[in-house]
């Protein structure tokens, strides 16, 4: 029997590039399989998805060699309409997938295009709304829903077409930890009940392995480096060599001396034989320093309308030299809090800077106290050349040209961008663009740098580079605020966690202490790391084991 999806010596080169992105790939996927495709940024994994769903060659043009077939049909001979009946795609950003004004309209969109009879359309919308727990939301606007609800709507919108292949392009990228876990649960449930061929493109390996997959395919530099079971992959060094983060518990077990290469069931912590592993470490706490309050936020309130309060009487302090992680579920008010701190929105309440009420700050004045770096650097960049982008804020402030050059070159050196100072921004990677946006803020000398999801969508290599860079800035005396869904980032790179839930502060404590409070984690849609699960298996103190992990990672980074 022929494979349902088959790449044979398949290569693809974008018209805009000199070298092929995919290089003589030979790969097959059987009908009904559940496959995870992983790889670092720029590896070619997304290009595989684009070739399957028709984005290539219908939107992105290029030259293909070899063959790619789905159900025996040559993909490049099919129209985009024909491909849509073979492959349904759930995009990384659900907001980019919504068509209808209501959830019901959005679900019905594909059926309307297929001229399905009204009676059948209502039946199928009702069926899929029921399967994905959307019955109560059918008359709501998709844009008003939570991150997890949006994901279910976009899923229903493609599942309703009942295509045999379901393709997920980084489905976890914009979700809080619990919503991400629920999404993996949902994908697994749909795979089993709808009997689809399921392909997940992600780099968050541990999160996807929350539910079983049949195979993992590792791609880098346009080639298949591994094609086999998750257990076999975890026994190799391929993840570390190719910039993919392995499960946290596997990293800890390596440090504790477990013979990884000869261990079964590595992909499932519950099934691991840990009889030869133990941990008896204790906690050595650093002497806390007397905090120096930099910002004092008192009774902060904000609402888009009287019926829709977003921030509810928030009060907290930010200390000089701190690394503060702001966490919470999608829609909790984290980004709104950031906008209020930066004076982008009018709020009720008071913000004091070193004891001075700064309510009368202009946006310009506030930006010199708090520099805000957006999640997507492309939304901040407006100039063609790197030097000009970093210099823009100074030029707008009328700074003398000689001072501009001096300050820009200094900050480019700090950000590791000096050698690229004459480059066009278009030649940079995503991570480098992120550094450019940070440099454009740093050059204004703000006391605080506020970053929205600083590592979103980045593989382990770029994640580590970004966080090491932020650590260097912190060592230079900058106070860092990070809005994040990444529990490992919070654990390793912050001193304090502020948990926001429904516009209120649910907790304000050290990250490790937070992980030991399951009720707070549940309310805020956060989750414990697998280090805590491993500690339960080893019958040891999870906080001590977490400290051990952080100490080991610190040693590796030096």
UniProtKB/Swiss-Prot annotation:
ATP 1 binds at residues 39-46. Residues 5-246, 295-527 form the ABC transporter domain. It is a peripheral membrane protein. GO terms for cellular component: ATP-binding cassette (ABC) transporter complex. GO terms for molecular function: ATP binding; ATP hydrolysis activity; ATPase-coupled transmembrane transporter activity. Keywords: ATP-binding, Cell membrane, Membrane, Nucleotide-binding, Repeat, Translocase, Transport. ATP 2 binds at residues 328-335. Its EC number is 7.-.-.-. It is found in: Cell membrane. CDD domains: ABC_cobalt_CbiO_domain1 (cd03225). Probably part of an ABC transporter complex. Responsible for energy coupling to the transport system. NCBIfam families: PRK13648.1 (NF010167). Belongs to the ABC transporter superfamily. This is Putative ABC transporter ATP-binding protein SMU_1934c. The lineage of its organism: Bacteria, Bacillati, Bacillota, Bacilli, Lactobacillales. The gene is sdcBA.
């Amino acid at each position: 029997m022929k494979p349902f999806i088959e790449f044979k010596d398949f290569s693809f080169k974008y018209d805009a590039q000199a070298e092929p992105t995919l290089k003589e790939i030979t790969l097959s996927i059987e009908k009904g399989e559940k496959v995870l495709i992983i790889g670092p940024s720029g590896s070619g994994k997304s290009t595989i998805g684009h070739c399957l769903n028709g984005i290539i060659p219908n939107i992105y043009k290029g030259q293909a060699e070899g063959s790619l077939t789905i159900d025996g049909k040559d993909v490049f001979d099919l129209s985009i309409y024909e491909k849509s009946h073979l492959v349904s795609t759930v995009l990384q950003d659900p907001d980019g997938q919504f068509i209808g004004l209501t959830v019901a309209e959005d679900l019905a969109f594909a059926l309307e295009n297929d001229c399905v009879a009204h009676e059948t359309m209502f039946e199928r919308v009702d069926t899929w709304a029921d399967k994905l727990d959307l019955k109560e939301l059918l008359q709501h606007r998709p844009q008003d829903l939570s991150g997890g609800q949006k994901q279910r709507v976009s899923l229903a919108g493609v599942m309703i077409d009942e295509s045999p292949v379901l393709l997920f392009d980084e489905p976890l990228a914009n979700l809080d930890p619990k919503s991400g876990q629920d999404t993996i649960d949902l994908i697994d449930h749909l795979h089993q009940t709808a009997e689809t061929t399921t392909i997940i493109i992600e780099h968050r390996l541990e999160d996807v392995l929350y539910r079983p997959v049949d195979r993992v395919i590792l791609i880098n530099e346009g080639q298949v480096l591994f094609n086999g079971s998750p257990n076999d992959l975890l026994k190799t060094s391929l993840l570390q060599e190719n910039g993919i983060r392995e499960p946290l518990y596997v990293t800890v077990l390596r440090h504790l001396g477990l013979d990884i290469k000869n261990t079964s069931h590595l992909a499932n912590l519950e099934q691991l034989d840990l009889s030869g592993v133990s941990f008896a470490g204790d906690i050595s706490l650093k002497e806390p320093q007397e905090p120096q309050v930099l910002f004092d936020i008192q009774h902060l309130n904000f609402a888009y309308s009287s019926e829709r309060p977003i921030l509810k009487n928030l009060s907290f302090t930010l200390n000089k030299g701190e690394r503060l992680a702001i966490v919470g579920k999608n829609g909790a008010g984290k980004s709104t809090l950031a906008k209020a701190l930066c004076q982008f929105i009018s709020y009720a309440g008071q913000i004091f800077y070193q004891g001075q009420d700064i309510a009368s700050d202009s946006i310009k004045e506030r930006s010199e106290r708090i520099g805000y770096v957006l999640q997507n650097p492309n939304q901040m960049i407006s100039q063609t050349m790197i030097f000009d982008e970093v210099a823009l804020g100074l030029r707008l402030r009328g700074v003398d040209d000689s001072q501009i050059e001096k300050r820009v070159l200094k900050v480019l050196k700090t950000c590791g961008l000096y050698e690229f100072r004459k480059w066009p921004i278009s030649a940079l990677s995503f991570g480098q663009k992120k550094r450019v946006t940070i440099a454009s803020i740093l050059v204004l000398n703000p006391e605080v740098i506020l970053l929205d999801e600083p590592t979103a969508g980045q593989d382990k290599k770029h994640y580590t580079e970004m966080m090491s860079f932020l650590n260097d800035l912190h060592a230079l005396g900058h106070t860092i605020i990070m809005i994040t869904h990444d529990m490992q980032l919070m654990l390793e790179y912050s001193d304090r966690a502020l948990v926001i839930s429904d516009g209120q502060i649910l907790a304000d404590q050290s990250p490790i202490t937070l992980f030991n409070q399951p009720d707070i984690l549940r309310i805020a849609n956060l989750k414990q790391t697998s280090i805590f699960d491993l500690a339960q298996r080893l019958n040891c103190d999870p906080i001590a084991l977490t400290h051990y992990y952080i100490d080991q990672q610190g040693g590796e980074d030096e």
